[in-house]
From Swiss-Prot:
Belongs to the complex I subunit 4L family. Its EC number is 7.1.1.2. This is NADH-ubiquinone oxidoreductase chain 4L. It comes from Ochotona princeps. It catalyses: a ubiquinone + NADH + 5 H(+)(in) = a ubiquinol + NAD(+) + 4 H(+)(out). InterPro entries: NADH_UbQ_OxRdtase_chain4L/K (IPR001133), NUOK/Mnh_C1-like (IPR039428). Pfam families: Oxidored_q2. It is an enzyme of class 7 (translocase). The gene is MT-ND4L.
Amino acid sequence: MSITTLNIMVAFMMALLGMFVYRSHLMSSLLCLEGMMLSLFMLATIVSLNMNFTISFMFPVILLVFAACEAAVGLALLIMVSNTYGMDYIHNLNLLQC
């Protein structure tokens, strides 16, 4: 295992730890989730370049598309919660039920 791969895995673990520590605020959770997706993208890119399969080059792009969709939905939810309740606490998401 190279030092680059090890650093990317440590970055993923730190973002995962951040999700557990800062789970009360939506903005912090979204930032940690984006850090996780970025480290997964970098790891998938390195693995697909090392495998030398043509079909595996599409996986990082698909992962990046899903990360962009997740970020858009997360930011829309953050704006909706902060405009409605004036704060970004995650426990307010239970109040969004109809």
